């Protein structure tokens, strides 16, 4: 399934499975098998804890999505005296073919927090729709993206539907008009 996806024009693949089904082992195999097919393979996770666990298991560099796609653009002091950092989307890496593998994708949302929630934050990221921001950053003609996760896990904070956006073929088709493939272990 993965080989067929890599050789196709489709840009998005969902690798789904419950805990203990071999997703992490498969990530390591994907990296080994397709390292020469791309200029670079970037491995990301939705949280710092998830990236640390994955890094330790497969001995490969892993960053959070936020660290990989955002750059600090402004630091300000609010009326309350609280510092606030604002981040903008990094520039798209052109002329490079990159395979992005994102672990713990069930935690990636696409719903922005309310104005009240944003006012309380010390960090602000672009328009706060992480999935949309990631796709804006990573989708190009040369790149491929594999979202890995457990569809039975809780979905991201602020997601009001039962659907986990970053693991849903239907969501990508309806919201982003992107065709995708999927496989469940």
What are these regions (language model features)?
Residues 1-185:
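Conserved ATP-binding/catalytic motifs of P-loop helicase motor domains
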């Amino acid at each position: 399934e993965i080989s067929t996806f890599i050789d196709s024009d489709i840009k998005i693949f969902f690798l789904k499975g419950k805990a203990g089904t071999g997703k992490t082992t498969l990530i390591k195999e994907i990296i080994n098998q397709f390292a020469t097919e791309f200029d670079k393979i970037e491995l990301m996770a939705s949280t710092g804890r998830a990236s640390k666990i994955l890094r330790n298991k497969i001995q490969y560099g892993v960053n959070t999505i936020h660290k990989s796609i955002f750059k600090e653009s402004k630091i300000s002091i609010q009326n309350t005296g609280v510092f606030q950092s604002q981040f903008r989307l990094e520039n798209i890496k052109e002329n490079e073919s990159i395979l992005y593998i994102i672990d713990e994708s069930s935690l990636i949302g696409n719903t922005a927090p309310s104005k009240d929630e944003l006012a309380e934050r010390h960090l602000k990221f672009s328009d706060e729709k992480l999935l949309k921001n990631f796709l804006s950053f990573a989708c190009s003609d040369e790149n491929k993206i594999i979202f890995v996760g457990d569809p039975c896990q809780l979905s991201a904070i602020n997601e009001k539907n039962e659907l986990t956006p970053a693991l849903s073929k239907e969501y990508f088709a309806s919201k982003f008009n992107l065709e995708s493939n999927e496989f469940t272990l």
